[in-house]
């Protein structure tokens, strides 16, 4: 350090000190009233210790050496207590070097992971819809953003036929899923959210880890009172990522289960939030309809692109009873909707 401090050109820097590796990730941890545990990772190049922390959080490790996984637990907070915040300060032993994790707990009327019944079927046996949000941190949720967006999505779903007429046949649920961070990441940006939702391309959302994330979503949906593994194939899950980017997509499984990712697009209709809900959730996820377009000027039986469905995919979907809005015939009296 002394050599740098005395070297020509370096004396202009106000502070020159030895590099120390001490980083906590994430550097922010949030929660609502519920007692809950968050995972942290501390990177250090030497012995470290927790110098201070608010009394309402506990850590399973308060000292160590090198890289360490730490569990930080928020204590239960009484309803109506208001927000509380503080810092957990980590320090390298025998060195004046620190890093901090900001902790905040927000007051909210519902508990983390509490399942809410938005609507119960008053006719029939009840068809299950589960609307979930991803990328909503404790602050977003305490400000009402999650439930506002979920309720808007539900109304968009039932604002078009035939769902408008048959609304009384549906059970509708949501859950208070808190994400460590707010938003949705992409190819070059990782945002840690509850269900690992990320943007995978121009118009593609999904779980960062693929099938394991989808299984986690289905497991969460089964927390709803009338949803179980036995009827997941008859249940539609609608995921509302906390982003305004356009990128709706619906993942459908052979048995009938589906997860429709419907971001809050701010484009004009039909590419806005309402249109995405009606297309992905109502059209694909529930009705199992196929897209009535391709991405370029070509016939599907001669096209060899990888971006559009072709005859094989079409026939495969037809064999499952899907795509009743599509036909390969040019004869009007032979199409499924001919009357």
Positions of the model-derived regions?
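Solvent-exposed loop and capping/linker segments of extracellular ligand-binding repeat ectodomains
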Residues: 1-21
